[in-house]
């Protein structure tokens, strides 16, 4: 059951705008924020085939990661035809993203980065 339906979080607005172009695959990175550090915890990908999901649904899904997280970054990606990315390609893109994040946490700003309440976040240089 959704917990934020109708609240209109930054995430909900982002998803609605992005989905107007059709289904996509989202690379997701969960992070722990302990000022001044941002540490990646877990990553995954999901295929977004509809916009009936909201931030509350996402939070419920991300509970399955088994970690307490402070932020979630979403990196939408599409195949060459503008649709869903095959699983194997999504896994490869996720590994590339993980490598880039190990080198530079500011990469999080290239995605859509949200706190636990679905509000926009941004990583600042220390």
Sequence positions of predicted segments:
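The transition from N-terminal targeting/processing segments to the mature protein
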Residues: 27, 36-48, 71, 102-105, ...
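N-terminal, charge-rich interaction modules
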Residues: 1-43
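Mid-chain, well-packed structural core segment of small domains
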Residues: 63-92
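Short, low-complexity cationic-aromatic patches
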Residues: 16-24, 60-69
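Short, flexible beta-strand-to-coil junctions
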Residues: 29-36, 75-80, 116-117
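Amphipathic alpha-helical interface surfaces
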Residues: 51-58, 69, 90-93, 97
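Short, solvent-exposed beta-alpha or beta-beta edge segments that form flexible loop/patches at the rim
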Residues: 9, 46-65
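Helix-rich interaction surfaces within compact, conserved domain-sized segments
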Residues: 61, 86-126
């Amino acid at each position: 059951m959704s917990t934020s339906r109708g609240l209109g979080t930054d995430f909900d607005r982002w998803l609605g705008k992005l989905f107007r172009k059709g289904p996509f695959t989202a690379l997701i990175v969960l992070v722990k924020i302990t000022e001044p550090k941002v540490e990646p915890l877990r990553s995954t990908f999901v295929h977004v085939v509809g916009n009936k999901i909201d931030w509350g649904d996402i939070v419920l899904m991300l509970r399955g990661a088994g970690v307490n997280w402070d932020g979630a970054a979403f990196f939408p990606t599409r195949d060459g035809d503008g649709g869903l990315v095959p699983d194997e390609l999504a896994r490869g893109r996720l590994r590339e993203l993980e490598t880039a994040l190990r080198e530079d946490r500011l990469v999080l700003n290239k995605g859509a980065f949200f706190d636990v309440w679905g509000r926009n976040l941004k990583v600042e240089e220390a």
